Amino acid sequence: MTCMIQKILVTSISLLMIHTATAQPISASSLTLEQGLSCLDWAEKELSFSNQLALGERTDISTPAIIKLQKQFQQQYSKQKTTIIDDSDDEGFCEDCPETTVYLPRNKSNPIQRIETSMHVSVAGVSTSIYRADDIKTTQQKIENRLNIKFSRYTGQQFKNFKQQWDKALDQDKDNGKRIKTIQVFQKYPHLKVFNGEVFQNQKIYTPKQIYIYSQPYKRDTSYLNDMIAFISLYDNPVNSSQHILQCGFIDNVF
């Protein structure tokens, strides 16, 4: 299992994104959300040479010095602490698709501190989270400009209100056997039902203060009939004020 995870991480974390899209540079103004679902598209464009080496994006360079540097970095990269969540009591447990966390070497020139990948088992979907140490507003502007999108902004309190109303609406819809109340709540707070940035720690739930979300309908491929939602979210790390988190992926629209 360790060898398999290491190979996946060093070659390209975006492989865990299944059928989304191969990571491409951000030079094209027509870049779509589907082409950028792995988040690494933005990361590779503005990132240090070291991360490009780790992600296997510089294998086309044949200079012996570069190859040597790449091997050295990949060794260092693979030695970083990697957490594999292996909880067989979880109803969504899947031995062949663990969640992984990679801590990148600390480097002032590289704002990305760690990358997490997660595959949802109970519902179809995957996501990538990138933990950044730079300014959240700068990240927001970069993504909006490069993808030609506009984030919807929410506060932590709005998300709490949404959850309370959503839970109540779910109960009412279960009683009625129809999706009426939940749709009304979603229309009031569009995008928020894909957000999962809360952190449970020390018996307490921590909610981000700033939340930016963009979402749109998504089809993974023509053979998959269910409706899906593709999303990008950007929010402050509620348990570490020096970081913000860029998350993107897709999930079944089963709510």
Give residue spans per PLM region.
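Classical Sec-dependent N-terminal signal peptides that target proteins to the secretory pathway
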Residues: 1-25
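Small side chains
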Residues: 12-14, 36, 197
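Short helix/turn-capping signatures at newly exposed starts of structured segments
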Residues: 23-129
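Short amphipathic alpha-helical segments that mediate assembly, nucleic-acid/protein binding
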Residues: 33, 62, 66, 70, ...
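Surface-exposed flexible segments
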Residues: 45-61, 139-153, 251-255
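Long, charged/polar, surface-exposed segments that mediate recognition or autoinhibition
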Residues: 96-212
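Low-complexity, intrinsically disordered Gly/Pro/Thr-rich segments
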Residues: 213, 217-237
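Short, low-complexity, Pro/Ser/Thr/Gly-rich segments in the mature regions of secreted, periplasmic
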Residues: 238-255
